[in-house]
Amino acid sequence: MSAIAGIVLAGGRSSRFGSDKLTALYDGIPLLHHAIAHVAAVSDDVIVVMSPSAEGEGLPAGARLVHDSSEGEGPLAGLHVGLLSAVRSDVALVVAGDMPDVSVDVLRELLLFLEGGQSDAVALGTELGPSPVPIVLRTWPAADAVHTLLHAGRRRLGDVLDVLDTVVIDETTWTAMDPGRRSLFDVDEPSDLER
């Protein structure tokens, strides 16, 4: 298998949460640490993309902090920074820092679909279409595509799936490994920490 970079997007403002949600405790551990641990289980390098003001204090050993200096430009800009930081990896596995329950089995399945095919991206299918995270990308085609999208004024993370050759794993396939669909659960408000 190719070298894999795990990119954890953690640059959001937590506006609905009311404080820095990534440091909030979920099952007794900071929320961000859950996402990092799941990504670390299946990748060779873990890159945590945070805002310029973030110091990254207390990040788990082995997690590498990179700053997204384009603050306010959206998650696609953070993805671009992460991809450019993954220069030694052919494959990038992308999750959001507020996704504490993403299944390692589902992440492995995403990687297997990419490794076994010719596509440049693999996403999980949902009733609303492909989920923008977690996703797996071929690093350089994705970096080029994201660069083009940003220059065209596009900012949504899911936009990259629109322009890359993307395979979408059928919902019945991936939910067999994650029947509760926890791989798509993200924390937006304090009450979400209780779910």
Regions found by a protein language model. Name each.
Residues M1-R181:
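Nucleotide and nucleotide-moiety/phosphate-recognizing core
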Residues W174-R195:
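Glycine-rich phosphate/pyrophosphate-binding loop and the adjoining helix
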